[in-house]
Amino acid sequence: MITENQLYINDLKSVMNEPLPWDKIDGSSVLITGANGLIASFFVDCLMYRNKTLNGNIEVFALCRNKEKSENRFKSYLDNNSFNLIIQDVCEPLNLNVKFDYIIHAASNAHPMAFAAYPVETMRANILGSINLLEYAKKYNPEKFLFVSSTEIYGRNNSGLNNGLKEEDCGYIDCANIRSAYPESKRASETLRVSYGKQYGINTVSVRPGYIYGPTIQDDNTRADAQFIKKAVDGENIVMKSAGNQLRSYCYVSDMVSAMLYVMLLGENGGAYNIANKNCAVTIREFAETAADIAGVKVVFENPGDIEKSGYSLIGNGVLDAGKLESLGWSAKVNLREGLKRTISIR
């Protein structure tokens, strides 16, 4: 079980060591949607670890769609009174009567094959999911509503070629391409949350993660970096299906979740914040080569299939400027090589 792995526990400890106003979250109730995912599952583990080791007394509500998968992932918490598992599709209105202090909306299709094969479901989860969560927030007025957006909302954009994309940069997205189902619906969801905030007085923020990786990544994730990690863990050669020259801002999951906490507890109402490690802006190929070197395997090349190609991101530059986030006091702690070593070791 991942929560018993000492390296993973060290990652949880590192988040707890952040100089945050923990009194704001201790004793609170927190709803996390998409709780099975790479980012949200680590967030759940952080809160439960705080309860166990620091008497956080946080009531955690993990909303997931897949009952079997979620019960397996969180089986060590199922008998814990501070943990509540909610099985529901976010496309349906929440039939709950709980006043959450914090709502973290992280439910979304999050990998290319899903975008290509299920563009409608991708859009529904983002847009209807956001509406349903925001309607719930309108009723109960939480301390903060945090929406997990994406670097892809910047579209094709050359604004940040030198120093990274800032929160006000906005590039072109081809709305007639089905691959745009993901970034367009993330954009719409960001506009929804600021609209609800303005019209109904809800305190909202959003985070725009770069390319997040870590031991909580799932085997069925078809994103290139996820597949590189899977191959490395299995001791197999890493297969690249493009030249891999696109630049990406990578960030280890513990740094991602600590950043979310900074934004949730200290972020400006209505604000959006990039999350990226400024020392981990590398090409996809460099990411693959680093993982291969750690695992002692090779990088090989193979032609992609048609469905795979249709799911590829159209973004060339995916480097983010996280200066706004850093102004809150956050800094990334884990470099790329160390993050990949931890990921491969823990998995």
What are these language model-derived features?
Residues S150, E190-P215, A226:
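Conserved beta-loop-beta element that borders a ligand/cofactor-binding pocket
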Residues N109-M113, T151-N158, R179, G210-T216:
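Active-site segment of SDR-like NAD(P)-dependent oxidoreductases
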